[in-house]
Amino acid sequence: MKTMKRVKTVATRLSDFGKWYTDICLKAELIAYSEAKGFIIYLPYGYALWENIQKHLNCTLQKTGHQNVYFPLVFPEKLFHKEKEHIQGFSPEAAMITTTGKKNLSEKLVIRPTSEILFSQYYSKTITSYRDLPKLYNQWCNVVRWEKTTKPFLRGKEFLWQEGHTVHATEQEAMQQTLSILDIYQKLGKDLLALPFVCGKKTETEKFAGALITYSIEALMHDGQALQAGTSHYLGIIFAKSFQIQFQDCDNQKKYAHQTSWGVSTRLIGALIMVHSDDEGLVLPPYVAPMQIVIIPLQTQDESVKQVSENLFSILQKNYRVHLDLQDKTAGWKFSQYELKGVPLRIEIGKRGLENDEVTIFQRYNFAKQNIKIKDFPSQIPQLFETMHNNMYQKALQHLEQNRKQATTYEEFKTYLKQGGYVAMSISGTDAELQIKQETGATARVILETNLITANCPVTNKKALQTVLFARAY
């Protein structure tokens, strides 16, 4: 048997959380760095995670009547200036194409940072009657935003996402769409990713550039920092006025259409890593894992062990994403490798176990090992996966709830903030929010639909108007 180098370990979360995170991204072979700074290569294992998210969300959106489309990567710069608030929000990050070969372009082309402009321009040409509504379009694509500081999956100059763009006849219909998408995202987190989210409305300073209202899903990472994992925006008739998206209603009146836009991105993969993983490497929930089960024969040269392994693989691959590892490497090396890659379930097959018609199963998320009869094993997998997924969700939910506090004074707020997690406080408005951000680095995550904690704002001593959840965030 070949002598193999031991699988490289990752940094610990307590010693260096940032290095621990990038170690997992690189050593679990999710990504590689490219030659262009701020751009990553999605390796097969990492891209498969995104594909599984796509499949799940596509299935849901098809049931709700949404259709997938693809719009161009670029649009003329002149369109960028049609909606002032939108351009103010995105122009600092917008990348432009100015030359082709040695020639300057007669008109600069903007590489999409988001696609509200492209969709609005199209809708203005194609929507004329109430019979054309609603339009429920979704796009899977890449976008480019020239970020100064980058981190794999969380913040990059290019990232992958889905962006929905819908058009409706009334405000009520558009708002219903905005909130229903928020529910879909929350369900995606719970059912596929085992991620609990805090959901709510964004403050005026944190809302999307060009939106009337923004809602977001927020996840809490293991280090106590928040991560905005997705957003859903009610755009009102702002873009409709800028791009003249009008329709003839059933009463023969010309009206502006109401729009929404919404999206989740590969940030969800970053959230998966930071919430579930441990000091041994990646930990993945079973339903999203690219490789759900790995079968490891302990004696690869033994014919009976090999035969049972191949038979079991043949049975399991009909319903699961399963891999049979027949490489000429030590079992210990393989164990470490698949633990690093976060494979939810490992099956160890050896001569001693076969004497009792048993295999050993290992669950990655809690390191539990048990022997089980070969004939009983396939029928028990659904329950194993369900328990595994639910336990991972509950663990993440417990972490979120234990790190969610409320403050009645500014000093108490600062103390809680240093401990990490979410801190709720009733504030007077934007003035208090900006002061908090400047003095503590915490940002408003969502507005809570709860009673005021205090009558006056602890920061400004003015009358408190709303209770806001704050955190330091990625």
Swiss-Prot record:
SMART domains in the cross-refs: ProRS-C_1
SUPFAM superfamilies: C-terminal domain of ProRS (SSF64586), Class II aaRS ABD-related (SSF52954), Class II aaRS and biotin synthetases (SSF55681)
A Gene Ontology molecular function term of the record: proline-tRNA ligase activity
Enzyme Commission code: 6.1.1.15
Pfam families membership: HGTP_anticodon (PF03129), ProRS-C_1 (PF09180), tRNA-synt_2b (PF00587)
GO biological process: prolyl-tRNA aminoacylation
Domain of life the protein comes from: Bacteria
The reaction(s) this protein catalyses: tRNA(Pro) + L-proline + ATP = L-prolyl-tRNA(Pro) + AMP + diphosphate
GO cellular component: aminoacyl-tRNA synthetase multienzyme complex; cytoplasm
Location in or out of the cell: Cytoplasm
CDD domains: ProRS_core_arch_euk
Keywords assigned: Aminoacyl-tRNA synthetase, ATP-binding, Cytoplasm, Ligase, Nucleotide-binding, Protein biosynthesis
The record's note on its domains: Consists of three domains: the N-terminal catalytic domain, the anticodon-binding domain and the C-terminal extension.
Protein's job: Catalyzes the attachment of proline to tRNA(Pro) in a two-step reaction: proline is first activated by ATP to form Pro-AMP and then transferred to the acceptor end of tRNA(Pro).
NCBIfam families from the UniProt entry: proS_fam_I
HAMAP family linked to this entry: Pro_tRNA_synth_type3
Entry similarity comment: Belongs to the class-II aminoacyl-tRNA synthetase family. ProS type 3 subfamily.
Assembly, per entry: Homodimer.
Official protein name in the record: Proline--tRNA ligase
Lineage summary: Bacteria, Bacillati, Mycoplasmatota, Mollicutes, Acholeplasmatales
Gene encoding the protein: proS
